[in-house]
Every structure is written in C-alpha cells, then in structure tokens.
Amino acid sequence: MKCAVSDFDRTLYVERMISEEDKNAVLNWQKSGNLFVIATGRNLGTIKPIFESYGFSPDLWILNNGAMIADRDGKILFTKLIPRETALAVLRYLQSVNDDGSGVSLTDRKVCLLSEKGTSTQKACDGGTITADQLESLDNIVQIHRR
C-alpha cells in the first residue's frame, strides 16, 4: 500500500473545479489499494461538500494546516485546539489594529469576525459572521485566519 498526499486549493482544485482527469487518477489510485490524503488549510465544513459534489472522497483529511485530522467520513481523529484565552486575545488584538475582519475555524465550521466597520475579507465562512461582542461565544478554536 502506498499513500499520496495532495494540497487542495490551486493543486487539485484549480479554478474552482477538480478536473475529470484528476478525479479519475485519484479513484484509480484508491481502487489499486492505495491511500489518498488531502492536506489543506481549510476546515472540513468548507471542503467536504466539494468532494461530495464530485462523488469521491480522500481516505484521510488533514485540515486547518494540521490542527485537525479526520477519517474519510469526517470523524475527527485528532484535534489541537488553540487555548480559548489565547485565541480570544489574538482576535481582540486584531480588532484593535483595525483588522479588516478575521476568520476563525472551529472544529465544525469557520466563522467570519466582522471588523468594526462591519466588513470581512474572509472567504468561505460556512458558519456565518459574528461581531466582536460575540467573541466570548466561541469555543473549540483550531485556527485563526487573517488576510
């Protein structure tokens, strides 16, 4: 058995699509008894639906730049959370320097933290948006995003 690991954005997923050629190569690789792994900065909620729309899935997901690992079905096998107070301190700091909106990946979704102007430069926030007043409600933080 062999294992192939691929990045997602701009590697397997180019111009917002997975080519038929790449999909077939992955499926043939897996049918030959090999493992296919995706390693990405994305969270499961923003990437798994894309694979579902193409009708295939990696054998393992390495997510949030390694902070989370899940099996083929999305069952979490490993998570390294950012201590809550540390994450909140970083997010408050970003707000204080007129950040244009940060993103926060939780174990189950990504939320966009709106700037004081009510804007966000973040993409793919499947968990919606929150304001600085709602920061205290965040838990299970695995990654902080800033553009």
Question: Can you say where each PLM-predicted feature lies in the sequence?
Answer:
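Short, structured coil segments at secondary-structure junctions
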Residues: 54-57, 65
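Substrate-recognition element of Asp-dependent hydrolases with the DxDx(T/V) motif
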Residues: 26-49, 65, 104-108, 143-147
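Short, acidic loop-to-helix structural element flanking the phosphoryl-transfer center
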Residues: 16-34, 79-88
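Asp-based phosphoryl-transfer active-site loop
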Residues: 2-16, 90
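HAD-like small-molecule phosphatases
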Residues: 51, 67-147
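Short, flexible loop segments at the rims of nucleotide/cofactor-binding pockets, characterized by
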Residues: 13-16, 39, 122-123
